[in-house]
Amino acid sequence: RIRYKGIVCDRCGVEVTSSKVRRERMGHIELAAPVTHIWYFKGIPSRMGLVLDMSPRSLEEIIYFASYVVIEPGDAPVEKKQMVTEREYRQLKKEYGAGFKAGMGAEAIKELLANVDLAGERDELKRELQEATGQKRVRAVRRLDIVEAFLQSDNKPEWMVMDVVPVIPPDLRPMVQLEGGRFATSDLNDLYRRVINRNNRLKRLLDLNAPGIIVQNEKRMLQEAVDALIDNGRRGRPVAGPGNRPLKSLSHMLKGKQGRFRQNLLGKRVDYSGRSVIDVGPFLKMNQMGLPVPMAIELFRPFIMKELTTRKLAGNVKSAKRKIDKADGDVMDVLEDVIKEHPVLLNRAPTLHRLGIQAFEPVLVSGKAMRLHPLVTEAYNADFDGDQMAIHVPLSDEAQAEARLLMLAAGHILAPKDGKPIVAPSQDMVIGNYYLTTEEAGREGEGMIFSGVDEARIAFARKVVHYHTRVGIQTSSFPAEKPFTDEQRSKVMVTSVGKLIFNEILPTDFPFINEPSEDNFKGVDDRFFIESGEDIHDYLAETPIIGAFKKGFLSDIIAEVYKRYKVTETSLLLDRMKDLGYEKSTESGLTVAMTDVTDLKEKPAILEDAHNQVATVTKQFRRGLITDDERYQRVTEIWTKAKDIIQDKLIESFEPTNPIFMMQDSGARGNISNFVQLAGMRGLMAGPGGKIIELPVTANFREGLTVMEMFISTHGARKGMSDTALKTANSGYLTRRLVDVAQDVIVREFDNDSDRGVAVKAIMDGTSVVEPLYDRILGRYAMKSVFDPETGEKIVSRNEMIDEDVAKAIVNAGIEEVTIRSVFTSTTEHGVSVLDYGRNLASGEEVEVGEAVGTVAAQSIGEPGTQLTMRNFHTGGVAGGNDITQGLPRVQEIVEARIPKGRAEISEVTGVVTAIEENPAERTKAVTIEGETDTRTYTLPLTARMRFAEGDEIQRGDAINEGPIDPKELLAVTDTLTTESYMLTEIQK
């Protein structure tokens, strides 16, 4: 029974009802004059303009009362829809009175729209389409589209003009009282208020029969008020509120990232989720995360309540709830069981690729920070300097199963973008394994021979040997599964104590790893074995020291283990490698002191030499022998060279045991340029305009910079910071557009019998190899059988996967070009086939039907986008070198098929370059190409760098000079395949 049923409010005469109608009851404003809807008038293309076949500009003049439009010409010498000025209108009205009719404002537009005969227009347009070409045709097609749409939807064109404005419910445009008696209100209320005020004033003026010009002005103001309400700022200056801030109109409420759709409908906040700071959890297994107890209680609350009631620890749900709030002892007992086997999802923003969300099994930890496994930080691009992550609980059984099967972190060892391991040890773990596998000549106990690994461990524990000691071990002591040859098993293997310990973490039947080379994966090289009884000291005296295992090699080991043993074994190995690394890096006691930053004796001499060279160049400039540009170019070259010399000398002077060198050499942290800045010189700095300042910073951080040097350095540092902020936004937007176009490319079938493929060869940039042939064919299917050119034997047959061995064989046979199945030539409807796509990089297996490869590709281009800098790069300081757009802007340029900056001319014919004539007066040169049928001449700027000389043969579609090609031109001259291949090549650079 509703208490207030049927009662009517005595103040306002509205029936009393529940307050939620404030969110659903609309009102409306009846306008005293019609008003056009700005979306239909200003949207691109202007829908009103298309229906009436008038330009948006003339529409604007009519709507905002600047000119009259003829509605009925009568006998007057004017056309229908012609624009006339005020003066002309009065003249015509006087002369042709009765039949002549013209008007202005939305009323006139409404009448014109009402007069449109849609069916007639449609037939007219269809006739026109048969002969029209070019722009006319495009316009006709657009008009036909809209006319058809009106006919099919039964909407009338005159409805684009409004007589009534709807008012949204009051709770959707709230007004709240602030402290101090002021009110805060939604912008919409202001906008509605302006409409109401102007509308009422217009009504009053009409009742008073005010002069036409005043009414006209008021109608225009009403039109503008309604425009601002619907889409503020679309036309003219936006209406501003207090503090000159543009008011948010109805359109803005829906638009963009902060609008209704993306913010609240696609991006809701969800229940059973939380976020917290992350911290490192070295004690975790690969598929675990540490969940703080207070978070766990909150996230799993309904599960705990259910469990408490089923175990009869609480009488009903309400008492269970009370128990949880009191943090009863029972709750903790139940919690352990509830979270067991219940995976949770962890996400770190920005989620750049699919590894930004992974599933883990929670383990309860104390404190308030979530603990993350150190190896997955790479995939999340997370660090522990205060990063936060979000956690989500999958509720239904299906969701849990999906998280467990598809998203467990242990299964995501390879990155989907290139198939290389993304969970590789970093920092401490790297330095630990590096330290462990280092060898040193002459350490204590060198040349001892052990009967087995355990004996070596005992010797180490008793301080007889060190990890770095080079020792021998009887090969026969290894388990039978270890791949040694029979000959090797009868000998003694020379290795180091640390390597014996390192190899214990590898699978039993994995080869013993004794040197950081890929060949070692096939088995240990015979050169590490000596006969039992041979003197090991002689052997050690002659044999050079083997390098330690660096970060890249650890990654190779992981990839190899993954290839052989798949997920489970690899994740176990990763955990063992992590624990070993942490343990040994702790034992190594690696420290850094000021004394580790060594002084370079030769530095003053190198600097003096450079200063002298600069003085010489300056002298030449003063005498007028060289231009200012040349002087600047040479000075910067001299200093760059000086810095390089210092860098080389520094590397020579390093002790291999220098901790800073070890950090950098192992790949744990830092690179050579950090070190050069500490111990060498900082070198040339970029100025505020991006131009290099020719005064170098000769000091390093150890000596300390002068005030002047410090000041010069700040430009570059500041630019770096602002670049980073800008490029993140750009890259995110690029990824979003890429995903948008590629998301429906899915693997639909196994094979589509396509008879076309793509011939691939190594991608070159000038003379340097960007991507070798091996990388391009690996994991793809051959289109044609490939034969060895020497022996003629078949290496791979058609539609067979090219795996590592086949790819090596092809490269070793000296074959430079292979035709492979490709997604470019796929004939599958709405997607691609398994044979076209090849191997799924994330799993190393052939791709499954149903894999969303388009999205994976989009994310793989978008994710490194953040790493690409915004910088535009000068070509090695060569005067006249074109400014080549690099990094992110270049990728965007390719993807959007824009006309690139500094583009190259391309040849439209295949033939021979017959002449290159320079014309200094116009700063151009003409290149003539003689084809089989016709001859073409191209005009290039004088400074353009040529790719062909006279007499060279040229193919159609080749660039004549250096620079990027415009993809649209290339497409016109050649076929889709060439263009696709060109775009692919460019992006890979």
Swiss-Prot record:
Cofactor note: Binds 1 Mg(2+) ion per subunit.
SUPFAM superfamilies: beta and beta-prime subunits of DNA dependent RNA-polymerase
Any one Pfam family match given in the protein's UniProt record, by short name: RNA_pol_Rpb1_5
First-level EC class: transferase
GO MF annotation: an example: metal ion binding
Transmembrane segments: none
GO biological process, one term: DNA-templated transcription
UniProt binding sites for Mg(2+): 383, 385, 387
Catalysed reactions listed for this entry: RNA(n) + a ribonucleoside 5'-triphosphate = RNA(n+1) + diphosphate
CC annotations in GO: DNA-directed RNA polymerase complex
Keyword flag ATP-binding: no
Entries under InterPro entries matching the protein: DNA-dir_RpoC_beta_prime, DNA-dir_RpoC_beta_prime_bact, RNA_pol_asu, RNA_pol_N, RNA_pol_Rpb1_1, RNA_pol_Rpb1_3, RNA_pol_Rpb1_3_sf, RNA_pol_Rpb1_4
Keywords: DNA-directed RNA polymerase, Magnesium, Metal-binding, Nucleotidyltransferase, Transcription, Transferase
Enzyme Commission numbers on file: 2.7.7.6
Keyword Nucleotidyltransferase: yes
Names of the cofactor(s): Mg(2+)
Family classification: Belongs to the RNA polymerase beta' chain family.
Role description: DNA-dependent RNA polymerase catalyzes the transcription of DNA into RNA using the four ribonucleoside triphosphates as substrates.
Subunit organization: The RNAP catalytic core consists of 2 alpha, 1 beta, 1 beta' and 1 omega subunit. When a sigma factor is associated with the core the holoenzyme is formed, which can initiate transcription.
Protein name: DNA-directed RNA polymerase subunit beta'
Organism expressing this protein natively: Leuconostoc pseudomesenteroides
Lineage: Bacteria, Bacillati, Bacillota, Bacilli, Lactobacillales
